[in-house]
Amino acid sequence: YNPNVTIDDGSCLYYGCTDPAADNYDPNASVDDGSCTYSGCTVAPFLETFDAFGNLGPFTDDFGAGGSQGATVAWTQDASGTSSGSTGPSDDITGGGYYMYTETSGSGSNKTAILFSTCVDVSALSDPCMQFNYHMYGATMGTLEVHVDGVSVWSVSGDQGNQWNDGQVNLPIGSTGCLIQFVGLTGTSFTSDMAIDQVSVDECVSLAVYGCTDSTAINYDPAADTDDGS
């Protein structure tokens, strides 16, 4: 505010919540002050194992919910291996539990599967990250992406071997309502069943770097901190 001004030039700044999806959205605010609040958000830290059949925790399969976010095939809760050989996991990462996967037999190839979260409140975390395990085994494997607030922040394509791998993405510091999507872009045939498991939102951690840690070996990897037997 300038008391000497007689004509408003439109430069006034009004602080408040500028997100229309928030409970306390202020249509008069021009600068977001980080005060937005959202009802029904999942508060971090949390861990979703998918082990309670029929219960996906804070996540929803978009295809099963009508496909409003663009899904053309489902993420399916499963245990003990997928129906096709030479693709997909044989078990969940801990053994004996459930995971989420995309079935690409029949009409499931060249499709998009979307698993989306409720809003996630990470404001209690100083360095928020989402950690998860993924399995991408198959000769015609497609692409797995993670989107945060509509932006792709992580992507892996192609056959990653017949094992569970570790993934981690940073989440926006201070956010009281970020949105997460796992987007599976299936491959060209039935050997592209991808899966995810053990999704957690917590403080960031240092992930293991697998490779040959023997400095006398010809394939020694100085960046590796965990030997993978190669």
Regions found by a protein language model. Give the residues of each.
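Extracellular calcium-associated, cysteine-rich motifs in secreted modular proteins
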Residues: Y1-T42, S206-S230
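Extracellular glycan-recognition surfaces and repeat-rich motifs
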Residues: P45-F46, A52-G106
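Extracellular beta-rich ligand/substrate-recognition surface
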Residues: Y101-A113, V156-G161
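Extracellular carbohydrate recognition
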Residues: G108-A113, T186-C204
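Short, surface-exposed beta-strand/strand-loop-strand elements in extracellular ectodomains
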Residues: T143-D149
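Extracellular carbohydrate recognition and processing domains
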Residues: G150-S175
